[in-house]
Amino acid sequence: FRKAERVIDFFVNYCITENGWVYSLYDTEKGAPFASFGDASAPRLHYMYYEKCKGNYLRTMTEPMLDLLEAYLWYRKKGVKKEKWLESVIRFANFLLEKQNADGSWCRAYSMTGEPVYMNDREDYTTEENDRGRKASTIIPVMFLCALANCLGEEKYLQSAKKAGNYALGHEVRWELYQGGTMDNPNVVDKEASQYMMAGLYHLYQMTKSPEYLEGALCAAKQFVTWNYIWNAPMRKGNILFSRGFCTKG
């Protein structure tokens, strides 16, 4: 438990900024965190790159903060209150509320000052297609906000989650178009997007008992399982997985 506490305390002390924006990467050699994109001096960890500003993705900020909330709740059950952890969780949640668009969406990435980053717009796409790509990760914070609303009993976090869920129902579930779940590209359909949609809407259903959220979760789930059991993702020639005849089914 002590070792786990030290790891979590390190994350809280060094990776969460005053405005709620979150680092998800840390360079142990330099002794400093670094941005997921836009930091020329940092290790390049992904083929997608953006040089105009430093920032992080909505997904890679939300995932560790949900873990932090779960850790807080686990320790609380053991009779140990980690108030600094909860304060950090709330700071990020308030960052989300502040950055949520009027239509209920969030952008896929944000600069360190909290400005939305549009890194993959395409000239051959319509305005609607580019806008949908910019907001393709909207469902991702919903589980986190539902969990926090349940923890604190504060309606504002549930209302924010519902706004995001309603946006997702109208712009993604309605068209059965689940894209932008990975960091690769906001306009690529992927299994993570349908998985997050399923999980986020199901959490909303559990919190509200509104049937439209359960129906949306089921719709996303039907596409998600095809990635696990039917769809055999192609492998690029020259890749070691291709040479071994690797299959993604099952």
Give, region by region, the residue ranges found by the protein language model:
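Glycan-recognition and catalytic cores of secretory/periplasmic carbohydrate-active enzymes
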Residues: 1-250
